[in-house]
Amino acid sequence: MIVIGRSIVHPYITNEYEPFAAEKQQILSIMAGNQEVYSFRTADELSFDLNLRVNIIISALELFQSGFQFRTFQQSFCNPQYWKRTSLGGFELLPNIPPSIAIQDIFKNGKLYGTECATAMIIIFYKALLSLYEEETFNRLFANLLLYTWDYDQDLRLITKTGGDLVPGDLVYFKNPQVNPATIEWQGENTIYLGNFFFYGHGVGVKTKEEIIYSLNERRVPYAFISAFLTDTITRIDSRIMSQYASSSTPQTSISFIPIRDDAIVATVGHTTTIY
């Protein structure tokens, strides 16, 4: 269910020729049909969220095709022209290097980088935002970047919740409770949901849910009896906050609305929104 202000609406793309119009309409239809409430203050916020999701998917596929390597933190490596590898295996931005240039280099020269899946997801988020921000704004927000698991910049505002409905562009986690300790890096897999039942995970590639579970199950202890599974934890970029930095030159998606109800009372507790 999508709410703009106090109005429950069914949105639709008005320009079928704009880039990724079909994919955007699919995302809108999924959100409108879900039981979960997606609340936005304005239509521009919804437009930003929609374009952000599309760019997350694009960035995930670009990273997959870049040659970016899967490595544990002990074996991680990065391009020393832009990053310094820390003692824990993270990537620290070198002084006087614009974050925008360094993030783009990961996608241009993926073979010069290797790390594990959580860091890859954060890299995808940064790249998606870079597609919607002016470089000056991006560099100001994310100066002194450190890429290391979930240690992301304080200005990157994320929402993690349990029990939401899956939407393309969401980050979701597969858990492998009986992983073989010899390959502990396969205790789970962070993935971006691409839509149409496919996920991208750094290390497993683009696969269906069943294929990722099969891959993780192959890395369990001998005689394991508990299967890997897709958890109900979802992580998203907070569009309400991050939309305020969007470039004015970024084309807005043209969205019109079929009103369903205009007197909704919207209550939000934590990251869960309820309609009365």
Swiss-Prot record:
Any single GO BP term: sporulation resulting in formation of a cellular spore
Enzyme kind, highest EC tier: transferase
Keyword terms: Acyltransferase, Sporulation, Transferase
Entry annotated with the keyword Transferase: yes
UniProt keyword annotation of Acyltransferase present: yes
Annotated coiled-coil segments of the chain: none
Domain of life per record: Bacteria
Catalytic activity line of the entry: L-glutaminyl-[protein] + L-lysyl-[protein] = [protein]-L-lysyl-N(6)-5-L-glutamyl-[protein] + NH4(+)
E.C. number(s) listed in UniProt: 2.3.2.13
Molecular functions per Gene Ontology: protein-glutamine gamma-glutamyltransferase activity
Recorded family membership: Belongs to the bacillus TGase family.
Function: Probably plays a role in the assembly of the spore coat proteins by catalyzing epsilon-(gamma-glutamyl)lysine cross-links.
UniProt-recorded name of the protein: Protein-glutamine gamma-glutamyltransferase
Native species: Bacillus cereus (strain G9842)
Gene: tgl
